[in-house]
């Protein structure tokens, strides 16, 4: 027996989320159907509210309710150092490290030739414009330690060095192939402290 068409449509939409396969999408769909209507309404409202209120910071491209975001607006932060991350989730992970007091830039992804993601598909041009405009002395590249993150790091380092800006990469402590957003605060803190010049 086939699933009813409305359930099939839910499964098709939910499995488009990152990390959600067909079976998980099916479980989530049936779970949502069993939820009390008030909970379903709250879920829908929270999604719509987040979509409506969240903005991309015009300076760092982080998601925020305000533009500029609270980090870019914080006058106590070091304005001459920028940590470049792939996603807002990575920014949140690094920002939990109290040792780092600089600013951020969210690329919105990583270079991936196999997936046809090139420099024009992420915010590299916007980053370079910011680096030319602001008085930045150092860029910490905090992309993931997988092949996409490494390709992105090398590409960025080559471009940024031409601007005469010091480029460093997070030091050891992050597992090869690992995502920054899943690393604990101590690991990220050690990686920042042990960053290497590129």
Swiss-Prot record:
It holds the Pfam family RecR_C. The keyword Zinc-finger applies. InterPro entries: DNA_Rcmb_RecR, Rcmb_RecR, Rcmb_RecR_Znf, TOPRIM_dom, TOPRIM_RecR. A zinc finger (C4-type) spans 57-72. Signal peptide: none annotated. Residues 80-175 form the Toprim domain. It comes from the Bacteria. This is Recombination protein RecR. It comes from Endomicrobium trichonymphae.
